[in-house]
Amino acid sequence: MSSKKYELDAAAFEDKPESHSDAEMTPQKPQRRQSVLSKAVSEHDERATGPATDLLPPSKGLTTEEAEELLKKYGRNELPEKKTPSWLIYVRGLWGPMPAALWIAIIIEFALENWPDGAILFAIQIANATIGWYETIKAGDAVAALKNSLKPTATVYRDSKWQQIDAAVLVPGDLVKLASGSAVPADCSINEGVIDVDEAALTGESLPVTMGPEHMPKMGSNVVRGEVEGTVQYTGSLTFFGKTAALLQSVESDLGNIHVILRRVMLALCAISFILCMCCFIYLLARFYETFRHALQFAVVVLVVSIPIALEIVVTTTLAVGSKHLSKHKIIVTKLSAIEMMSGVNMLCSDKTGTLTLNKMEIQEQCFTFEEGNDLKSTLVLAALAAKWREPPRDALDTMVLGAADLDECDNYQQLNFVPFDPTTKRTAATLVDRRSGEKFDVTKGAPHVILQMVYNQDEINDEVVDIIDSLAARGVRCLSVAKTDQQGRWHMAGILTFLDPPRPDTKDTIRRSKEYGVDVKMITGDHLLIAKEMCRMLDLDPNILTADKLPQIKDANDLPEDLGEKYGDMMLSVGGFAQVFPEHKFMIVETLRQRGYTCAMTGDGVNDAPALKRADVGIAVHGATDAARAAADMVLTEPGLSVVVEAMLVSREVFQRMLSFLTYRISATLQLVCFFFIACFSLTPKAYGSVDPNFQFFHLPVLMFMLITLLNDGCLMTIGYDHVIPSERPQKWNLPVVFVSASILAAVACGSSLMLLWIGLEGYSSQYYENSWFHRLGLAQLPQGKLVTMMYLKISISDFLTLFSSRTGGHFFFYVPPSPILFCGAIISLLVSTMAASFWHKSRPDNVLTEGLAWGQTNAEKLLPLWVWIYCIVWWFVQDVVKVLAHICMDAVDLFGCVSDASGSGPIKPYSDDMKVNGFEPVKKPAEKSTEKALNLSVSSGPHKALEGLREDTHVLNESTSPVNAFSPKVKK
């Protein structure tokens, strides 16, 4: 039958191999090597438990004025964060490869006394820096606003009243309330009373620690039981979080990968443009005997227009828009460049508890009974009777049982006596009387092997119970036995309940989707090996699991070998996850996978996860993570579960597609422009077609037209961050050779069509060739010089915008994905402005280049010249798109530059075996430990409790010390 499942925080059940807390350590446990984190904790604990004179006396509360004075003295209660001044952001926008080229052009124009052109270039420089500064500030404000939603609060006694305030403004001497369910907002001393504190996020200890006035709860821990008043002793960098700063500094902050890519693209385009423009400059001096001034002016203007001035601005805007989109999916981005890295993730190292699982223990449907009339419902009622069912639960086990049992049925009984859980007996017991029949009986619930020793028919059911225990243990499922006395006072086994922290309903499907999207998932947990194996089986992950003793032992996290990936990569790739790991193992696992060639994402929630989060390409702090984990992470989840991470990947891939289409377009536009003027300078010169104008011996545009093209294009490109795209089905990585090839194909068609129109225009302009020109065949009058210049301006401008629509769909036709309304409207507006400017341009001579509007004319045919240019551009746009698709088909067929290869680690993966040695490496054995294998080989004939005794001293077996839950953990025989 189905029963109500109760959800319980699984942190209390998760088994981790180590404790650094203030609680008493189990004496049998061998002392493990001390990590960097352990040293930080020890140093902090020494200070916290030092002489009483080092600590403030119990506080009775502060006034607002006192708190403000102390805040000025001690600073805010938060991790220090470096912020770039606003003015420095603006100054940076005025310097760099792109701005430097523009400054050179401005200086040259002013040196040549071209004041209007120099002023235009200077205005563009200032406008570019201002827009870049504004977009950067806006993106930073968006991230800061999202971060503010993560700020913790604290209940503090100020001005003679309790109030809720931002934990960041706490100061030493504040009186705070530490209550069940709340986070400890700072390092506090307890004034009076005791509380149970969960320090798992700080120390790895899975069991709550009981703390009194002699202890100091640390910021980042959580109160799980009780309520006390405490005095704030340390805040900000003086807390344990400050003590872990040295560990986090072992990972240097890498420059975002996207900035490296942008620099490469900018330098490549600048180099190409500079070389071609210098060739034009030299040729003009030699061929046309142009003055140094005119030749230099032409070369500089073409160079300035060809370089992508707004490249970083558009990318920053696109990433900022992506971060807002991610926030709608419950993902807060703390570093914009992480979005680009997330799109290339092909390896996800995920926590088990809370991410893959519900982080809630549940009673399962499977229930084993030994007498007729007993079932899951009746067994749950008996288990609830062995507790105070109408009082707040005393422990995690009672909480789980009472949440699943029918408490109304329990009210039919009166509890005469109750014995709470005792770590020695490992069970609870109660004496009850049935209000309906008056029958008096005892009930008990506890560890299966303990209850088995109590029942009167142990010999009859021993083998059956042992088989059940072994089968459940082999699957990593915990179990709880319930027994009841009969009228003779004999104990009868009522049933065996099973419980575990189940997977989230969507986890299995999410992992399947992840693999379909090219992302491998590795589970990392501090839990027992058997529990990890069972979870992998339930989630269709490889149940082959590595434990901590199989991993390489690294002494210093600051000095990791550079050959980890080569030596141990195959071993780690061949398994489905890692169990019984320590915090530094996570750090090493991530580094090994990165060295193996994978783009690795890591999820974590505690201070001890912070180094691994920092080391990963993308660190993800899961829902409920500590401030230290959030500070180290690139992304913070505000909703639990793995599905949120997959959504982050898909949204990031959408952002990547937008940046890819923009870079492809920007490279194409640059190549189209510079190659057009380069070829036109050498082969299609007005002089060769009879031009006698000394200022029109070679074809060029006035600076104003160049700048109009630049401003309209860059303005339209600001909307590309909102474009519609389809995310890739595989991880994305930058393949710049392929990007340049794709852009070159688009540029070649656009440039070729522009050169052809220039040739047609020059023939229509020339008195010598007009009779055989297309202008004559179409019934158009001979083309004036001014209209030839304006026509080519319109052609180049239209081709630029149409190329944008081709570049955004990759290897598909331009209509494969409709553009977003904002991008479409931006392009239409820019095209209308260009068309209107070209049609009604005032007849003038800017920069001594004659210009004239295309719509000015005597006949209707002449007035329709802009329409002919549009038709010409659209026809060639279709040709460009067909050529693009065919080129992509050919590139995919030959896998040009690995364009269809997966973004995965390199090299084959060898199957893993227990005795696997990689390059001579053999896992280091821990000394003086009783292995699980030895305990598992004990004979069951002496009873399951004998076999279980051998497991009690093993550090990797679930802790049996004091927890009423861990007493029912899986133990198996070989």
Curated annotation (Swiss-Prot):
GO molecular function list: ATP binding; ATP hydrolysis activity; P-type proton-exporting transporter activity
Pfam families documented for this protein: Cation_ATPase_N, E1-E2_ATPase, Hydrolase
Catalytic activity reported: ATP + H2O + H(+)(in) = ADP + phosphate + 2 H(+)(out)
Coiled coil start-end: none
Membrane topology recorded in Swiss-Prot or TrEMBL: Multi-pass membrane protein
Keyword Translocase: yes
Compositionally biased intervals (Basic and acidic residues): 1-23
Membrane-crossing segments per the record: 93-112, 118-137, 265-286, 295-321, 631-651, 662-684, 698-712, 738-761, 813-840, 869-887
Subcellular location: Membrane
Signal sequence coordinates: none
One record GO biological process: proton export across plasma membrane
Disulphide bond pairs: none
EC number(s) given by UniProt: 7.1.2.1
PANTHER family: CALCIUM-TRANSPORTING ATPASE
Protein name, as recorded: Probable proton ATPase 1B
